[in-house]
Every structure is written in C-alpha cells, then in structure tokens.
C-alpha cells in the first residue's frame, strides 16, 4: 500500500518554502512512489481536515517546476491563534486524515507547538527549519535567511547613495525581536556604520558620539544605521528616562533612534527612517536558499522512509543531518554571541555595535 504523507508550512512566510515543497513532492513521488498531501494554512487546515493532493490539482511533477523561484508558500500559512486550545480536535483531525507521516516547515515557535501536538498524538513527525531570523537552534542554516539578508543588503546599497547625496543619517529598521542575526549579517555585508541588535545594549550617548566622530574626525557627513526591531538600550538609559515612551516595544526602534540623534545634535543632523517590514519576507529565493531547501526537503523524505521521526533536518559541518526536535525547541531561540567572530569583525571594521562589556 502506498504511503500517504502530509506537508505543511507554519509561522511567518519566507522565501524558499515552495522550494521545500517541490523537493518533497519530487523525491517522494519519483523515488518512493508515495502520495503527498498539502495541509493548507498550517494547523488551521489540519483542524479543518483539509488535504490537497500535491501530485494533482496542477501541482504534479510538471506543475511544481515553477515553485523553484516563487516566494511565499502555495499552501498558505498562519502565525497566530492558540493552537493548543484545540488539542483534542487537532489530534482527531490528524487521525481522520490517515497520514503515515507529516513533514512540517516552521520556525522555533511553530516547531514547538507542532512538536507538542505530535508528542500528545504520537504522530510521525519530521521538521524542516525556516526563519528569516536564523534563530532556530542546532542548525547552521534555515530556509529563508539568506534571501532576507540579500534583500536588506540590496536596500542598504540603494540607501547609501541617497544618504551620501544629502549628508543624512539613514536608519534602516529590520526584523529581529529577540535575535540580531539578520541585522548583524546584513549590516556587515551592506557596509553599515552602526548595527544595533537585541543581544548587545547600546547607549544614546555612545551612538551620538560615534556619529559625531564620523563627521568630525573622518569627514563623513552621512551614516547608515541598521537597527533590529528588538534592539535594547542600556539599563542606565532606561532608568534615567532618556528613552521616554519609546522604551515600549510598540514604538518603532528606528523612529526612536532618529528622534534621539536629532535631540543630541540639536536638529543639526538630518535623519530619515526606512522600515523594511515585510519586504524582508518576500522575493525570489536566493541560490543558497534554493539549495538548502532542496537538500532539506530530500532529507526529510528519507527520514520518513527510514522511520526516523521526532527529528528536524539540520545543517551542520556542511551536511544535512537529523537532530531531535525536542532539543531544538529546548535551545531556541538561538541568539547572537556577543563575543563571536561576526561581532568582533564588525568592531574591528569600526562599526558601532553597542557598548562593550
């Protein structure tokens, strides 16, 4: 009897998800002659017992070829709602679908929820990491991160010239509430002067002094500041009320920093803020994300064939390997190492990356 496996995408979208789907459908069909069913809109589709045959409905082996360069996910996804409030219904729905295994593509949050459901229902689960934040533990790669970095670098390339033309400080706010990998990688690669991330606190005085030094010592009248949305002020600044109402995470970090630079310079420094927002989640997947997604999808199918469940496909030392999902969940989110090579390299290049401890 042919195996029947399901696949779903969960959490925020990112480039490369369709590449994973393409690899799973191709390998499962060509190599193992299995049936592959897509679960639309993650746990919502699971709850509603929806399953789309991915070797039919236009997504057969010929139909999945365009997925290689498509952003987003053809299956749809959700990143809201209290899934664990419907555990019993979810478990019953999974049983009704009669799947031999389920391949899930998600970030640290959605993987934790799906692992919990799988543990309660004894599901045959295999996971694939995707995140533009690169904060999933135990893997050196995750689908979507490389494209997001390239998207930010492209924006920095464009904004640098307009900043230089007007002698402005250009502040670029990027995603990263709890981990600063995206800001750090893109900031270094994009030639930023300042990179502010959640893991290393900064001071307004230190930031303003650095920008003043660029102007006075190096005759640089423009600057590029990359700030993660979760960048944190030093505790002393918060306690002294320097941050005012903008200490709240609801206040945009980029706008707050622009206001503080204007205050410190007595409005002599012209600032502009660009919040990249969901542009970072879109776009055509990079070559590296396509390769990562393809290898991850193929490996996930092989793990199902080998009966190795409760595993996430990870990239370590140049190879795709299985690691226990429970270990990934326990160690996520993965934070930037403040003493790591990237932070040290940034500082050696003269980039302000917050205060040294």
Curated annotation (Swiss-Prot):
One of its GO terms (molecular function) is diphosphate-fructose-6-phosphate 1-phosphotransferase activity. Mg(2+) binds at residue 108. Substrate binds at residues 131-133, 168, 175-177, 229, 272, 278-281. It catalyses: beta-D-fructose 6-phosphate + ATP = beta-D-fructose 1,6-bisphosphate + ADP + H(+). The active site is at 133 (proton acceptor). InterPro entries: ATP_PFK, ATP_PFK_prok-type, Phosphofructokinase_CS, Phosphofructokinase_dom, Phosphofructokinase_III, PKF_sf. One of its GO terms (cellular component) is 6-phosphofructokinase complex. Its EC number is 2.7.1.11. Its cofactor is Mg(2+). The record marks 109 as: Important for substrate specificity. Pathway: Carbohydrate degradation; glycolysis; D-glyceraldehyde 3-phosphate and glycerone phosphate from D-glucose: step 3/4. Subject to allosteric activation by ADP and other diphosphonucleosides, and inhibition by phosphoenolpyruvate. It is found in: Cytoplasm. Homodimer or homotetramer. Belongs to the phosphofructokinase type A (PFKA) family. Mixed-substrate PFK group III subfamily. Catalyzes the phosphorylation of D-fructose 6-phosphate to fructose 1,6-bisphosphate by ATP, the first committing step of glycolysis. This is ATP-dependent 6-phosphofructokinase.
């Amino acid at each position: 009897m042919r195996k029947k496996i399901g696949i779903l995408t969960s959490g925020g979208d990112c480039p490369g998800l369709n590449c994973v789907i393409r690899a799973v459908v191709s390998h499962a069909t060509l190599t193992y002659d299995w049936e592959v069913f897509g679960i639309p809109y993650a746990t919502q589709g699971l709850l509603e017992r929806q399953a789309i045959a991915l070797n039919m409905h236009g997504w057969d082996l010929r139909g999945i070829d365009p997925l290689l360069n498509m952003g987003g996910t053809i299956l749809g996804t959700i990143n809201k709602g209290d899934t664990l409030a419907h555990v019993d219904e979810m478990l019953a729905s999974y049983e009704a679908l009669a799947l031999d295994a389920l391949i899930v593509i998600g970030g640290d949050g959605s993987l934790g929820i799906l692992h919990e459901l799988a543990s309660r229902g004894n599901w045959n689960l295999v996971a694939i990491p995707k995140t533009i934040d690169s904060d999933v533990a135990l893997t050196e790669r995750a689908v979507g991160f490389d494209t997001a970095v390239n998207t930010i670098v492209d924006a920095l390339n464009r904004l640098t010239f307009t900043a230089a033309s007007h002698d402005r400080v250009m502040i670029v706010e990027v995603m990263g509430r709890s981990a600063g990998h995206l800001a750090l990688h893109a900031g270094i690669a994009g030639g930023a002067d300042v990179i502010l991330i959640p893991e290393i606190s900064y001071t307004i005085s230190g930031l303003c002094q650095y920008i003043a030094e660029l102007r006075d010592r190096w005759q640089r009248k423009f600057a590029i500041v990359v700030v993660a949305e979760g960048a944190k002020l030093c505790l002393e600044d918060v306690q002294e009320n320097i941050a005012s109402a903008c200490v709240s995470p609801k206040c945009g970090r980029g706008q707050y920093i622009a206001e503080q630079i204007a205050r410190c310079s007595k409005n002599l420094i012209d600032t502009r803020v660009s919040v990249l927002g969901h542009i970072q989640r879109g776009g055509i997947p990079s070559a590296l994300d396509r390769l990562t997604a393809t290898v991850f999808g193929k490996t996930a199918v092989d793990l199902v064939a080998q009966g190795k469940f409760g595993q996430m496909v990870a990239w370590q030392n140049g190879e795709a390997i299985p690691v226990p999902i429970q270990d990934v969940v326990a160690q996520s989110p993965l934070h930037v190492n403040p003493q790591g090579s990237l932070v040290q390299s940034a500082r050696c290049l003269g980039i302000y990356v917050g205060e040294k401890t």
